Structures are given as structure tokens and as C-alpha cells.
């Protein structure tokens, strides 16, 4: 990376499902701080050099309704909702609390979905024991044209993003923001 970025003047970034706080250390350990990072699996583009969110793709309100339906149908599921700069949890127990510690973000815990501010959600993670998450995943994937993107991140988590959002979109966003004439590789 050092040779590519420093000697050849190339551009390199990291694309991750992580948030601003949990991505900071790995990102800043590389010589790439002048290039923004892709966060929240493409929902956010963050500039660590200027400490500024450059682009954020919040989940459509249809996504909120899906989360509401999941928490009603699967009351044991834990939910972590990541915004551009904070986290909310619903029904936080073992899995969501571990995520909150790892994320190291300002956060608020809620018992019910109706208590959660419904704006600025970048990524929703459904968490729990593998059989529960598998049932949630199966239920969500059975929806025709859900107007959101789903991503399987582990056997104990399943993620929801705005429709059309993924890490590749974030890389293209960086290319557009930087005025790059070449397509990202």
C-alpha cells in the first residue's frame, strides 16, 4: 500500500461495514487519510482528514416498516441501528451489547421500535442466536421487491441497507466525489 500510495501517487481506501469510530484506527494506520473511507457497507462516505461525512444514504421509510414487522414477528431478535454518528438498539442483550462495545459510538437503548427516532438510519443489524437470525433472514428474503438491500454478515447477524447501497456504491461515490476519470478498480 505504501508503495502504491506514496511512490506511485495512487488512491487507496478501505470499504467496511464499520462505523466512524470503529474504522478510525485501522484507517488512520495506513497512509491513506487523504482519501475518504466507505463506512456502513456503503451507506456512508467519511473524510477522516477533515472529520466530515461527505455522503450518507439513509434507509427509506419502507425499511423502517420492515424493521417494525421483524421486531413484532420475532420479539427475541436484537436490533442495532447505525446512523451517521450514533447507534440505537432495540431489545439489547448479549449480541447488541457486544456490538455497542465494539462500535464505541454514542448510543441509546430502547425496548420497542416505536421509541426509536426514525430518521437517519444508515444500517440495521438483526442479531441473535443463529437459528433466530436464520428465521429472520428467511422471512425477509421471502419479500418480493423489498425496496432495501439485505446482507448476510455472520451466522448471528443479518443486515438491512437502503435499496441499491453496498460497498461498491461507496467506492463509486468516492470516485465521483474526487473527480476521478477512471473507473474504480
Each predicted region: which residue ranges?
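Active-site phosphate-binding/coordination module
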Residues: 1-96
Amino acid at each position: 500500500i505504501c508503495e502504491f500510495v506514496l511512490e506511485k501517487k495512487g488512491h487507496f481506501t478501505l470499504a467496511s461495514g464499520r462505523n466512524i469510530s470503529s474504522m478510525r484506527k485501522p484507517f488512520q494506520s495506513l497512509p491513506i487519510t487523504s482519501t475518504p473511507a466507505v463506512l456502513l457497507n456503503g451507506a456512508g462516505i467519511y473524510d477522516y482528514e477533515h472529520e466530515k461525512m461527505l455522503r450518507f444514504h439513509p434507509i427509506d421509510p419502507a425499511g423502517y416498516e420492515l424493521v417494525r414487522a421483524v421486531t413484532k414477528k420475532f420479539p427475541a431478535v436484537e436490533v442495532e441501528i447505525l446512523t451517521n454518528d450514533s447507534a440505537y438498539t432495540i431489545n439489547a442483550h448479549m449480541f447488541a451489547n457486544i456490538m455497542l462495545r465494539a462500535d464505541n459510538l454514542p448510543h441509546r437503548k430502547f425496548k420497542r421500535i416505536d421509541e426509536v427516532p426514525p430518521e437517519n438510519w444508515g444500517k440495521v443489524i438483526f442479531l441473535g442466536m443463529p437459528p433466530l437470525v436464520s428465521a429472520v433472514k428467511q422471512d425477509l428474503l421471502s419479500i418480493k421487491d423489498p425496496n432495501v438491500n439485505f446482507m448476510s454478515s455472520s451466522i448471528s447477524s443479518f443486515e438491512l441497507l437502503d435499496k441499491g447501497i453496498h460497498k461498491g456504491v461507496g467506492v463509486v461515490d468516492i470516485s465521483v466525489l474526487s473527480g476521478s476519470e477512471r473507473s474504480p478498480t
